[in-house]
Amino acid sequence: MALLTDDFDAVVASRRAVRAFLPTPISRKLISEIIDIARLAPSNSNTQPWSIHVLTGEPKQALSALLGIAHNDPSADPLAHLPDDLARKYRERQEKWGELFYGLHQIDKCDDAGRARVSGLNFDFFGAPVGLIFTIDSNLKKYSWLDYGLFLQTLMLTARSRGLSTCPQVSFARFQSLIKDFLHLDDSQEIVCGMSLGYADENATVNSLRMPREMAQGFTHFMGFDR
């Protein structure tokens, strides 16, 4: 089987976190096709630790409404998805992301209300017709989360190869109890993240944003090669 390297490279290069979608419906058949390819991702000892909840229509709207209320509750705990003592190079990248993202929305660094309003769009899945919630057994160790990352990337690239776009969203992990209650899950499950899935609105300004990436030589270390 011949592999089309240029085509694969184009799929990888065109994948980005899309934050504005068209309402165009996505068929269950197409979503199932994407998941059926993503399931081939590798995992430690073939444990395959992933579980997906696929929402559209009324269920998606109902979950979004509940999450919107929770997000706007000032007593809700923030999501600590990065350590307070973040190393300088990671902090600088995070700050650059905030500068570019919120700058595009013309929101000042000190405008907490504006930032909360924009981040709240996460919970409407950025207008995408399909929302995905990913869960994992809570007693699994960090290596299974590595497996999960491989699965998520495979799913996103498979979706992209079919003309769809995605946005992986760790923000959903902030509301573990709410989402687990909605999905009728017990405490043996943990929310990994959410994901928006649909066709990108190419006319939306937010989708023009491209984040900088460090060049490969900045983090790659070769040993034993001639040059």
UniProtKB/Swiss-Prot annotation:
Keyword NAD included in the entry's annotation: yes
Protein keywords: Flavoprotein, FMN, NAD, Oxidoreductase
Pfam families given in the database record: Nitroreductase
InterPro entries given in the database record: Nitroreductase, Nitroreductase-like
Cofactor binding note: Binds 1 FMN per subunit.
Binding, FMN: 15-19, 213
Binding site for NAD(+): 45, 102, 107
GO molecular function, a single term: oxidoreductase activity
Catalytic activity, reaction form: 4-nitrobenzoate + 2 NADH + 2 H(+) = 4-hydroxylaminobenzoate + 2 NAD(+) + H2O
Enzyme class: oxidoreductase
Cofactor: FMN
EC number: 1.7.1.-
SUPFAM superfamilies (UniProt xref): FMN-dependent nitroreductase-like
Similarity section: Belongs to the nitroreductase family.
Functional description taken from the UniProt entry: Nitroreductase involved in the degradation of nitroaromatic compounds. Catalyzes the conversion of 4-nitrobenzoate to 4-hydroxylaminobenzoate. Required for the catabolism of 4-nitrotoluene.
Protein name: 4-nitrobenzoate reductase
Record organism: Pseudomonas putida
Lineage of source species: Bacteria, Pseudomonadati, Pseudomonadota, Gammaproteobacteria, Pseudomonadales
